[in-house]
């Protein structure tokens, strides 16, 4: 067994893998010990009940995901909550098909409170509330305030409904431990309005300026398929002038999800998970929160089993990945 390992793994380039045949559980134990002693990695064991089959062994250690992704992007650090799915807009690339006609599918304040408490105890360190448009909910102020009291919270919004009850809810929110992420796709109205509707750019900019004037930390996120020459530079320059720091300026691609007719095709295996809870279940990532292929569990409470499952599945995915997993930054 040891000779087979030396012969098949010893000549590999760093990071390459080889299959090594085994006939018993004892062979696997020997391989595990050899890998531990030699600095190699047993990636996977495809064996039957008797221990016969093949081991996949990697030359060298797996890269530490913390070093590659950063500690703040490891699975389980972030938790996304879809507060609702109905929206005042019908964006033509919405990854979860939100619109004024969409079913509301609200999580509800009490359930959100229970989920957030459990998540904090599990080890989640940051919350993201999204929709739909969260500020359409009559109790959104109480929901956001309770979340921000427990963990640092970011609320994704189109920034267009800050009038009346929603304006009062906005003004009541804490400034510490809370950020508002407002959608704006371009430095001028044409591109933004072509996807989100006539007049939406002006209203989104007004929402950004209002939130800044009220003392909130504001992030701005653009969703852009194929930016033309100079478009991104103009976008960043516009936000610089508005007063949004560069770390709070995000540009992300369109995903081929929801109502989008084009965009980046994603697979669960190619995404670093960011656990996402909706009224329908727990999903692998917020960009795929209505995609059955990304469903982790229909059981929302307790949340711990789903968090554990995602962590375990990602560890397995990381160990056997032949291609790098990719971040899809929603925030």
Where do the model's predicted regions map?
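Domain-level signature for proteins that mediate thiol-based redox and metal-cofactor handling
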Residues: 1-78, 82, 108-110, 114-118, ...
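Conserved alpha-helical substructure of the radical SAM core
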Residues: 67-131, 135-149
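Short, aromatic/basic amphipathic alpha-helical patches
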Residues: 30-39, 168-170, 233-242
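Accessory C-terminal segments flanking Radical SAM cores
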Residues: 254-331
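A cross-domain feature marking catalytic cores of carbohydrate-active enzymes
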Residues: 83, 131, 157-159, 182-186, ...
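Canonical radical SAM enzyme core domain
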Residues: 101-114, 134-174, 184-189, 199-203, ...
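Conserved C-terminal portion of the radical SAM core fold
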Residues: 126-127, 150, 154, 178-179, ...
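Conserved, mostly hydrophobic/aromatic
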Residues: 87, 91, 129, 155, ...
């Amino acid at each position: 067994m040891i000779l087979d390992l030396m012969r098949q793994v010893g000549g590999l380039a760093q990071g390459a893998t080889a299959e090594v045949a085994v006939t018993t559980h004892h062979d696997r134990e020997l391989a595990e010990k050899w890998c531990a002693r030699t600095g190699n990695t047993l990636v996977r064991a495809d064996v039957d009940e008797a221990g016969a089959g093949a081991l996949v062994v990697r030359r060298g250690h797996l890269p530490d995901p913390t070093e590659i992704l950063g500690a703040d992007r490891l699975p389980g650090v972030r938790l996304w909550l879809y507060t609702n799915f109905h929206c005042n807009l019908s964006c033509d690339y919405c990854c979860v098909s939100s619109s004024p006609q969409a079913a509301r599918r609200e999580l509800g304040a009490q359930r959100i409170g229970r989920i957030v408490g459990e998540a904090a105890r599990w080890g989640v360190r940051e919350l993201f509330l999204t929709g739909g448009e969260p500020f359409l909910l009559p109790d959104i102020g109480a929901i956001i305030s309770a979340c921000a009291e427990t963990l640092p919270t970011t609320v994704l919004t189109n920034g267009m409904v800050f009038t009346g009850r929603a304006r009062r809810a906005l003004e009541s929110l804490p400034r510490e431990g809370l950020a508002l992420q407002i959608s704006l796709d371009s430095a001028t109205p044409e591109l933004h309005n072509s996807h989100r509707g006539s007049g939406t750019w002006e209203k989104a900019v007004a929402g950004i300026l209002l939130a800044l004037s009220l003392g909130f930390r504001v992030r701005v996120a653009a969703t852009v398929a194929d930016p033309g020459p100079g478009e991104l530079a103009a976008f960043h320059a516009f936000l610089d002038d508005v007063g949004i720091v560069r770390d709070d300026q995000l540009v992300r691609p369109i995903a081929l999800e929801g109502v989008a007719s084009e965009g980046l095709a994603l697979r669960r295996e190619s995404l670093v998970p960011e656990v996402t809870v909706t009224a329908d279940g727990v999903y692998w990532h917020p960009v795929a929160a209505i995609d059955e292929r990304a469903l982790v569990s229909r059981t929302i409470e307790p949340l711990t089993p789903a968090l554990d499952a995602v962590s375990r599945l990602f560890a397995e995915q990381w160990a056997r990945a032949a291609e790098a997993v990719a971040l899809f930054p929603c925030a």
